[in-house]
C-alpha cells in the first residue's frame, strides 16, 4: 500500500503531554484509548510507561525514568525529553479538549485497523483460498469489533 495509514501525531502527542502534566487525566484517556491505538512506537511505549507509573501512584520525571529503565527501554533519555516536550507543546489541558484528542487518536486507530482488515480481505478474495461467504463474514465481524480492538478476518 503506497498511501500512509491514518494518523494524527499531534493528537497523540497532546494526549501524552496532558497525562504527563496531570496524571488524573489518565482515567479519562484510558476509557477511550489502548496502548496499541498509538501509531508511533515511541508513543506506545511512553503510554505504557505512563500507565505503569499512574497505577503505581505517581507519574513524574523520576518515576517515569525509573519505569523506562525497568522496562528495558534503551532510549530512556529520549522518552523523558519527549514527554517534557509533549507537555510543553500541549494546546489545552481542559478535560473536554483532552477527551477530544483521545477520540481523534482512537478514530485514526480504528481507521487503520479497518483499512488493514479490508486489504487482508481483498487478498483472500484474490487468491480464492476462502469462500466469498467466509470472507464477507470476516469483514462484518472485523467492522463490528474494530472499536474494541478485537476480531479478525476468517
Language-model features, listed with the residues they occupy:
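Noncatalytic partner-interaction/assembly domains of nucleic-acid and motor enzyme complexes
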Residues: 1-110
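Phosphate-handling catalytic cores of nucleic-acid transaction enzymes
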Residues: 148-154
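Extended, charged alpha-helical coiled-coil/arm scaffolds that mediate oligomerization and mechanical coupling
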Residues: 80-142, 148
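A general boundary/transition motif marking the beginning of the first structured unit of a protein
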Residues: 3, 7, 17, 127, ...
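Charged, low-complexity surface segments at secondary-structure and domain boundaries
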Residues: 1, 50-52, 121-128, 151
Amino acid at each position: 500500500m503506497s498511501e500512509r495509514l491514518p494518523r494524527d501525531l499531534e493528537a497523540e502527542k497532546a494526549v501524552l503531554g496532558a497525562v504527563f502534566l496531570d496524571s488524573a487525566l489518565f482515567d479519562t484517556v484510558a476509557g477511550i484509548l489502548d496502548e496499541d491505538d498509538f501509531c508511533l512506537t515511541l508513543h506506545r511505549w511512553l503510554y505504557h510507561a505512563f500507565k505503569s507509573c499512574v497505577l503505581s501512584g505517581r507519574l513524574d520525571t523520576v518515576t517515569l525514568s525509573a519505569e523506562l529503565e525497568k522496562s528495558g527501554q534503551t532510549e530512556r533519555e529520549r522518552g523523558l525529553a519527549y514527554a517534557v516536550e509533549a507537555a510543553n507543546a500541549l494546546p489545552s489541558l481542559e478535560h473536554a479538549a483532552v477527551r477530544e484528542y483521545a477520540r481523534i487518536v482512537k478514530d485514526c486507530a480504528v481507521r487503520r485497523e479497518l483499512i488493514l482488515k479490508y486489504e487482508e480481505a481483498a487478498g483472500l478474495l484474490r487468491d480464492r483460498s476462502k469462500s466469498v461467504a467466509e470472507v464477507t463474514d470476516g469483514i462484518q465481524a472485523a467492522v463490528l469489533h474494530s472499536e474494541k480492538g478485537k476480531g479478525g478476518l476468517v
